[in-house]
Regions:
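Rossmann-like AdoMet
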Residues: 1-139, 144-145, 149-157, 183, ...
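A short SAM/SAH-binding and catalytic strip from SAM-dependent methyltransferases
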Residues: 141-142, 151-176
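Conserved beta-strand signature within the Rossmann-like core of class I S-adenosyl-L-methionine
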Residues: 162-165, 178-179, 186-197
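Short "lid" loop at the C-terminus of a central beta-strand within the Rossmann-like core
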Residues: 168-171, 197-201
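Class I S-adenosylmethionine-dependent transferase superfamily signal
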Residues: 182-183, 230
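Short, glycine-/aromatic-enriched active-site segment of Class I SAM-dependent methyltransferases
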Residues: 199-216
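Short alpha-helix
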Residues: 217-242
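Core SAM-dependent methyltransferase catalytic element
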Residues: 239, 244-269
């Protein structure tokens, strides 16, 4: 079995097949957060989403700020020194390893995505501190076995891990199953940080439009659905809240409030 896992996780990252005529989740999100790694089809799709839901740019900004705060909390307050970032997206400012290694340069990070475009950008742009490490794993967010086997090359899975699932579970139909299997696989003392667009009427039209445009459907969820992901885990205060309410930092004072994103962090007891 170990040899089979090694073969599965040591395969080279797939060559990026880029279809610039079809909107891509990572590239559309890259446009929404002000990035330049996108094509005309992505920009047009993003503009259609903004037309349907003018809150979309604020959603993107709030999501990145939540990522920064959760990683900072895990590194600075919870003492986590290794991270598993699933559904990485195209790198931009304030990536997980940058935030974590600003607290402790020895932090180790594994980025996971199954989009070859994302992985090619990650290889080119994500650079660790000399004291720490970053690696990049080609795996689906639902494939817990492949994720854990691949992560074990860089992370010590006998020690707690900070699992980051931000901007990914909304593209997973059976998110509860994916979260549950990952929570079962990581060591006691590990943390899980998640974000999920809520069933807000401002996003409903945008979700319908996105599902007409793209091959990867998006799923909106309510607080009760998100709460079920944390069965058996200890939620960290303030629990499941709109992301701007999750331990806001002074530098977030100008961020918009009431963005329809739910966020939470929990610890495995």
């Amino acid at each position: 079995m170990a040899e089979e896992w090694l073969k599965a996780t040591s395969r080279p990252i797939r060559a990026a097949h880029v279809d610039s005529a079809v909107p891509n989740v990572a590239r559309v999100w890259n446009y929404l957060i002000g990035g330049r790694d996108n094509f005309e089809a992505d920009r047009q799709a993003a503009k259609q989403l903004i037309a349907a839901a003018p809150v979309m740019p604020q959603v993107a900004v709030a999501s990145r700020a939540f990522l920064r705060r959760t990683v900072s909390y895990l590194a600075a307050e919870a003492g986590i020194r290794q991270f598993l970032d699933i559904g990485t997206g195209i790198p931009t400012a304030g990536n997980t390893h940058e935030v974590a290694q600003a607290v402790d340069p020895s932090c180790r990070i594994v980025y996971v995505d199954n989009d070859p475009v994302v992985l090619s950008h990650a290889r080119a742009l994500l650079r660790s501190s000399d004291e720490g490490a970053t690696s990049y794993l080609d795996a689906d967010a639902r494939d817990t076995q492949a994720i854990m086997a691949g992560a074990s090359v860089t992370l010590d899975l006998a020690r707690p891990v900070g699992v980051i699932m931000i901007d990914v579970l909304n593209f997973v139909e059976d998110a509860a199953d994916a979260v549950g299997r990952l929570a079962a696989a990581v060591p006691v003392g590990s943390y899980l940080a998640v974000m999920q667009p809520s069933r807000d009427e401002r996003l409903a039209v945008a979700a319908i439009r996105w599902n007409q445009l793209a091959a990867t459907p998006v799923f909106l969820r309510d607080r009760d659905q998100v709460a079920r992901w944390f069965a058996g885990l200890d939620l960290i205060d303030p629990g499941i809240v709109e992301v701007h309410r999750w331990r806001p930092a002074p530098e977030d004072a100008e961020l918009p409030e009431g963005v329809p994103l739910l966020g939470a962090v929990a610890r495995k007891p």
